Amino acid sequence: MKSTRPFHPTPVITIDGPTASGKGTVAALLAAHLGFHLLDSGALYRLAALASVRYGIAAEDIDALVKLIDDLHITFREGCAQLDGVDVSNDIRAEAVGNRASAIAVHGPVRSALVARQRAFRKTPGLVADGRDMGTVIFPDAVLKVFLTASAEARAARRHKQLMQKGFSANIDDLLRDLRERDARDSNRAAAPLKPAADARLLDTSALSVDEAVDQVLQWYRALGQPA
């Protein structure tokens, strides 16, 4: 399938997919290979939440939250999320931060500010954007849209391995149940349900290594006439 989208001077590749589909790792390696900027949209919400706690801004103070989001100094580099130049990748995974992210994201102006920040990551020479609605909502004109899939069993096994490597105990059956429940919620929600864009390339990573998945995306990108 050849893209009919016009060439954009600052190309974007979107990598969407469900939890533990490998999109974060694939996006980071792809960005490093191409020398592109990287956006981890899920981490962006958590970074805003963490900053709001650190600066003492209440979850109900919409005006202060919007200003905070506009002023945040955020970078994603080599798989790390940085706030004000400090790696906070572990801090943003805390349950309390996740709860705060959910609490602030219910406000329309806050969501709009976060969408604007995501789009501001589009800078030369290009961007790889990882998330759930990158190709459908945030960057509908992306030169290449990829939707990663994998069986729930494969994703649960990956998440279990990740947690064990980080020193956390985890039950794979519980992880599998949680993933299936989250998939159902994400696919059926009214606002920006998790689904591939109509013109997205589907890539099942169940039996693929990370390198194989990255190579496939690079092949698609080259086929569009883009240097890779």
From Swiss-Prot:
InterPro entries xrefs: Cytidylate_kin, Cytidylate_kinase_dom, P-loop_NTPase
Gene of this entry: cmk
Catalytic activity as recorded in UniProt: CMP + ATP = CDP + ADP; dCMP + ATP = dCDP + ADP
HAMAP family: Cytidyl_kinase_type1
Protein name listed in UniProt: Cytidylate kinase
EC numbers for this chain: 2.7.4.25
Protein family: Belongs to the cytidylate kinase family. Type 1 subfamily.
Main location: cytoplasm
Pfam families cross-referenced by the UniProt entry: Cytidylate_kin (PF02224)
NCBIfam families named in the record: cmk
Alphabetical GO biological process terms: nucleobase-containing small molecule interconversion; pyrimidine nucleotide metabolic process
Domain of life per record: Bacteria
Spans traversing the lipid bilayer: none
Source species of the chain: Burkholderia ambifaria (strain MC40-6)
Keyword terms: ATP-binding, Cytoplasm, Kinase, Nucleotide-binding, Transferase
